[in-house]
Amino acid sequence: MRVADFSFELPESLIAHYPQAERSGCRLLSLDGPTGDLTHGVFTDLLEKLNPGDLLVFNNTRVIPARLFGRKVSGGKLEVLVERVLDDHRILAHVRASKAPKPGTELLLGDDESVKATMVARHDALFELHFDDSRDVLSILNDIGHMPLPPYIDRPDEDADRELYQTVYSQRPGAVAAPTAGLHFDEPMLAALRAKGIEMAFVTLHVGAGTFQPVRVDTIEDHIMHAEYAEVPQDVVDAVLACKARGNRVIAVGTTSVRSLESAAQASQDAPIAPFFGDTKIFIYPGYHYRIIDALVTNFHLPESTLIMLVSAFAGYQNTMSAYREAVAEQYRFFSYGDAMFITHSPMAEQEKVG
């Protein structure tokens, strides 16, 4: 399967650089998987598309201010992007510098260069850094870090991004990118969903910087996914099984919720799904057999990205690419701060030919 099959033309003007004034004020393109039919609307239309007893599964990760600027004590400037917090004093990070720091290199981090750190070891493309500070890592990042806006949002981060690039239900710090489908849910929307009898459950997947890495191979099967830490606790498993038993739908809010639930299903030995705590490298592309998800809320994804492949595996390749062409023609806003889709599963997607 060719990566190029997932390309589409996207005018630069359709990339959203700022969010909507109201979280739930975005547009919603609904794609009916079985028929391929498209419906244009607004995000609050989602209320009418869900039935009492349906289960929405959210990702409650919280974005950390993971981008740091500074220099080596010896002089060279550098930029640090945290990939993972290892413990209270150590991180794994991407480091951009004219010359990669060697083990033992001392760093001065923060806009005022007030925080000392040491490069301890290199692990492939990532650097292990130790903060020489009495505060824990998250406190340091909150004090000196910048919000890690995606590379396609071509502007410096602003103070407002600390909350805007964050879901209202985020609880577990550790992500370096927001689970962006969740950005559209505000408190009134969540209250309206509860009032209608929609069930809710929360997984955790700490989105890594690898989510923005382009696919660098020509053939999809050759791509190796980055690892991300995910948790699907027992209460989520119970909610999913109860939802299925009563004949309702499991609806994932975002591709990270999809990947968490499907990882838990893959790891389960004898039940449809079991609790999951650990790294996942699940790569979902056409031909994948979905085990848990019946519908999906998601944003519009980058051309040739693993996420448009995931959507194609769910809704069908032709359905997905047609929907994206329609979204471009109708000038929907794309990517993290953009508009949303509501998609139901196509039973034919698994067998469909790509290209």
Swiss-Prot record:
Pathway: tRNA modification; tRNA-queuosine biosynthesis. One of its GO terms (biological process) is queuosine biosynthetic process. It catalyses: 7-aminomethyl-7-carbaguanosine(34) in tRNA + S-adenosyl-L-methionine = epoxyqueuosine(34) in tRNA + adenine + L-methionine + 2 H(+). It is found in: Cytoplasm. The keyword S-adenosyl-L-methionine applies. The keyword Phosphoprotein does not apply. Its EC number is 2.4.99.17. One of its GO terms (cellular component) is cytoplasm. SUPFAM superfamilies: QueA-like. Keywords: Cytoplasm, Queuosine biosynthesis, S-adenosyl-L-methionine, Transferase. PANTHER family: S-ADENOSYLMETHIONINE:TRNA RIBOSYLTRANSFERASE-ISOMERASE (PTHR30307:SF0). Transfers and isomerizes the ribose moiety from AdoMet to the 7-aminomethyl group of 7-deazaguanine (preQ1-tRNA) to give epoxyqueuosine (oQ-tRNA). Monomer. Belongs to the QueA family. HAMAP family: QueA. This is S-adenosylmethionine:tRNA ribosyltransferase-isomerase. The lineage of its organism: Bacteria, Pseudomonadati, Pseudomonadota, Gammaproteobacteria, Enterobacterales.
